[in-house]
């Protein structure tokens, strides 16, 4: 599932390639993926894509008319949702949720082979209508998420550290992969409970979160390919590397779980 660094890179690429492009037609070949009526889509011709933004695990495309944002396209790609920029004459793939035909004979298409993603087309003042939006905490890389704010917020969220980092009510944008990376960098076990952390542990967790996300975002801005597929995560130190040597101590990394695997080092990340 794309996380904060992946989506930041995709948003930058979408902005570079689509900023200022005019929509001439909009359809939903697989309408179950799109929270919009045919009338909503029919009103889009003439709007301009004003780049792309990211909030939590959502991509946001502001759609402007006469210099004013008229609609927001909010996309949570989940496990397999992908954007494609392709020629308008290209065959429309199965499970294409949204097709925006652009001036210049190109399309922006959203394809989701797992049919799990969600697209919302709504007014710019209606984002709170998206389930869970109003409860979302600050982005994990937000400038105003200072160390002091982090200390205050973490006191309100009990439980194990890995689910805590993945809880969008605490901080938004972190999923299974980067929670492993952050906890390994901080030297904290994923199953350790927040109540066992001292002030130094909390500070170390905060700085690890910021460092890991900053580094990954910088790397993915370089690696993101022209077709806007998220890059395979060679940049990750430990996630899904169970059985390999720990990059820090050389001991074997342990991995548990299946599709939602957790990878950690029992030496570098002691239980307490």
Region roles according to the model:
Residues 1-119, 242-243, 255:
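Gly/Gly-Pro- and Ser/Thr-rich, intrinsically disordered tail segments characteristic of DNA damage-repair
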Residues 3-6, 10, 19, 128-132, ...:
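Alpha-helical structural motif
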Residues 22-43, 53, 60, 65-70, ...:
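Basic, nucleic-acid-binding surfaces and adjacent catalytic neighborhoods in DNA/RNA-processing proteins
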Residues 68-173, 178-185:
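Phosphate/anion-contacting hairpin/loop surfaces
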């Amino acid at each position: 599932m794309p996380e904060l660094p992946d989506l930041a890179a995709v948003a930058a690429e979408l902005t570079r390639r689509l900023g200022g492009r005019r929509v001439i037609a909009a359809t939903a070949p697989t309408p179950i993926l799109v929270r919009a009526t045919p009338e909503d889509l029919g009103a889009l011709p003439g709007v301009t894509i004003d780049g792309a933004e990211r909030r939590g695990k959502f991509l946001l495309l502001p759609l402007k008319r006469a210099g004013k944002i008229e609609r927001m396209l909010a996309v949570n790609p989940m496990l397999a949702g992908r954007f494609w920029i392709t020629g308008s004459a290209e065959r429309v793939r199965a499970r294409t949720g949204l097709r925006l035909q652009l001036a210049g004979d190109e399309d922006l298409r959203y394809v989701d082979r797992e049919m799990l993603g969600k697209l919302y087309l709504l007014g710019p003042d209606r984002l709170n209508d998206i389930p869970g939006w109003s409860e979302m905490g600050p982005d994990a890389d937000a400038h105003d998420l200072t160390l002091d704010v982090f200390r205050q917020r973490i006191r309100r969220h009990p439980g194990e550290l890995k689910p805590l980092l993945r809880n969008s009510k605490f901080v938004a944008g972190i999923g299974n992969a980067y929670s492993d990376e952050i906890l390994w960098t901080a030297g904290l076990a994923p199953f350790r409970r927040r109540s066992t952390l001292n002030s130094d542990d909390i500070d170390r967790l905060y700085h690890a979160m910021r460092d890991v996300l900053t580094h990954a975002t910088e790397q993915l801005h370089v690696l993101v390919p022209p077709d806007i597929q998220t890059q395979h995560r060679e940049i990750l130190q430990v996630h899904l590397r169970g059985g390999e040597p720990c990059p820090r101590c050389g001991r074997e990394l342990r991995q548990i779980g299946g599709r939602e695997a957790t990878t950690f080092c029992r030496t570098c990340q002691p239980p307490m």
